[in-house]
Amino acid sequence: MNDSEFHQLADQLILYIEGQLDNYDGNADIDCETNGGVMTLSFDNDSKIIINRQEPFHQIWLATKGGGYHFDYKEGQWICDRSGDNFLTMLAYAITEQSGEQFSFP
């Protein structure tokens, strides 16, 4: 993958997350801000989730209360380089844990 392909895939992921959060109709207050390629999700309990792109490694990094994770693009999805879990699955779990309300991506 070249840098241009990486940025296109990373942009698609960020736009998808933003769209899902915009359509979220649950009770938890989840604020979403994207600035300079870094997405910050903020919750009522003052916890945050940070999603950012690491261009030199062609990775997406996820920082949650539970820890930090690095994701590589493999076979059409972002996969954790340690656990092998899907990015959206891990993000949904982190949002559920930090918001106190069940969250999932379609």
From Swiss-Prot:
PROSITE patterns, per database record: FRATAXIN_1, FRATAXIN_2
GO cellular component: cytosol
Top-level taxon of the source organism: Bacteria
UniProt keyword annotation of Ribonucleoprotein present: no
SUPFAM superfamilies with a match to the protein in the record: Frataxin/Nqo15-like (SSF55387)
GO molecular function annotation: ferric iron binding; ferrous iron binding
Entry keywords, A to Z: Iron, Metal-binding
InterPro entries from the UniProt entry: CyaY, Frataxin/CyaY, Frataxin/CyaY_sf, Frataxin_CS
Keyword Metal-binding: yes
One annotated GO biological process: iron-sulfur cluster assembly
PANTHER family per the UniProt record, alphabetical: FRATAXIN (PTHR16821), FRATAXIN, MITOCHONDRIAL (PTHR16821:SF2)
Membership in a protein family: Belongs to the frataxin family.
HAMAP family, A to Z: CyaY
Function description: Involved in iron-sulfur (Fe-S) cluster assembly. May act as a regulator of Fe-S biogenesis.
Protein name, entry field: Iron-sulfur cluster assembly protein CyaY
Organism: Photorhabdus laumondii subsp. laumondii (strain DSM 15139 / CIP 105565 / TT01)
